[in-house]
Amino acid sequence: MTESCDSGSLPLQDDVEKFLGGAARFNLYPDDDSVKYFEKKVIESFLDKVEAGIDVPNYPQFRDMSEMFLAMMEGVERVKGGYIEAKIPSVRADRNHIPELMVIKRNSQMIREKTGKPFQVKVCVTGPYTLSSFFIQRDNEIFDRLGNTISQIVENNIFSGKDGSAGLIAVDEPVFGMLDDPLIDYGSEGRENLRKAWEAIFHKVTSKNVQALLHLHNTADELFWEVKSLNIIDSHTDDPVYQMKKTKEQLEATDKFLKASICT
């Protein structure tokens, strides 16, 4: 079981535009100055987390966590007021890996030499429900379409080597449970499609012997308990799930763990 992991990163204090440019050019122009800057900041931040004693640090998250995954999708277009599906979303061939994770993977040997042992990294992706909230038009199958794409991104970014590996995959759903959304009303087709989308993503994770975590900001809607392949539930420190008596019973009944969240 994971001992400790973190969520996100402190804001980048240096040249944000150069960092974002490096992330965008990462696959096409490896010798570009902005790409080298991007790599340097990713490694520095990741090593800071390791040296702080975090067992499974998340890759540095200095970019918008929704836009970065929507940018990895073919068939998705940004328009005034949000996004639209020009065709069924799929993973772009030239952007099928998370640049931050590729930097860490390429520098695995150096990281291991500095830490003195093989390392694990937490891979955070934004979930289909939260991504759907950016679309102007939503139907009850949008969770399935976006979920298939995120599932492929997850599969592409799970790695394991002698120096380091992906030890935890976290699906971030900060919007879930925060809105009154008819698409996921109890008994609706959309609700079942969201459950299936989560199940498909987490099955990809657990089939690789990697732990699967769902990060929420509100657990009032208990759909997540029905996801069989989900190992770990995580929410904000003030979420009632941490104090409710029935939580322990549900954890035991569904064979899941609850991550203890700490604010520092």
Language model: regions and residue ranges:
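Acidic (Asp/Glu)-rich catalytic clusters
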Residues: L47-E51, I104-Q120, I158-G164, H203-S207, ...
